[in-house]
């Protein structure tokens, strides 16, 4: 019987560049026609964590269920966040997040983002463990090791 081994990560750094998201293509969330968001992978993409930089824009509500633990740090913009916590989704809440806010979405949380600001709701998503979202690496960090 073999014993699993620890997969060690590498040190990575990313400096949040507005131009990375400003130049990214508009994407649409699955199952939410008319939704619009932008996302880039920061290059921090290891077995234990994936960090993406995202914009959600005013319009359609974004409804999602996270399959991993996720911490988000808001860089700019403002959004109302409604959450429903597992296991039965009975425990719920609604908050407003804005620049400087940081929050945890525990694994299994159903979340609804409603962007309130005219500017995008720009945020860093730190996902544990790495969910493997197929997001292209930020232009400013393509050559980083």
Please describe what each predicted stretch is:
Residues 47-71, 87, 107:
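Conserved short histidine dyad/triad with adjacent acidic residue
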Residues 6-10, 87, 112-145:
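Double-stranded beta-helix
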Residues 63-64, 81-82, 105, 110-118, ...:
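Short beta-strand His + acidic residue motifs that chelate non-heme Fe in jelly-roll/DSBH
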Residues 86-107:
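Short acidic-glycine-tyrosine-enriched beta hairpin
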Residues 40-43, 52-53, 61-67, 83, ...:
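Short histidine-centered beta-strand/loop micro-motifs
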Residues 75-76:
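A cytosolic small-molecule/anion-sensing beta-strand core signal
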Residues 71, 100-101, 111:
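Hydrophobic/aromatic beta-strand elements that line small-molecule binding cavities or substrate pockets
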Residues 1-53, 61, 141-145:
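A short, N-terminal "cap"/entry segment at the start of jelly-roll beta-barrel domains
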């Amino acid at each position: 019987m073999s014993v699993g081994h620890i997969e060690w990560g590498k040190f990575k750094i990313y400096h949040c560049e507005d131009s990375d998201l400003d130049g990214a293509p508009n994407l649409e969330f699955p199952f939410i026609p008319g939704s619009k968001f932008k996302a880039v992978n920061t290059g921090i993409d290891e077995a234990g964590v994936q960090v993406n930089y995202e914009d959600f824009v005013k319009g359609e509500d974004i409804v999602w269920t996270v399959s991993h633990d996720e911490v988000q740090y808001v860089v700019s913009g403002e959004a109302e966040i409604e959450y429903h916590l597992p296991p039965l989704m009975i425990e719920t809440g609604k908050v407003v997040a804005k620049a400087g806010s940081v929050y945890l979405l525990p694994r299994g949380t159903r979340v609804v983002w409603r962007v309130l600001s005219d500017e995008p709701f720009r945020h860093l998503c730190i996902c544990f463990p790495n969910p493997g979202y197929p997001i292209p690496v930020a232009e400013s960090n393509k050559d980083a090791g």
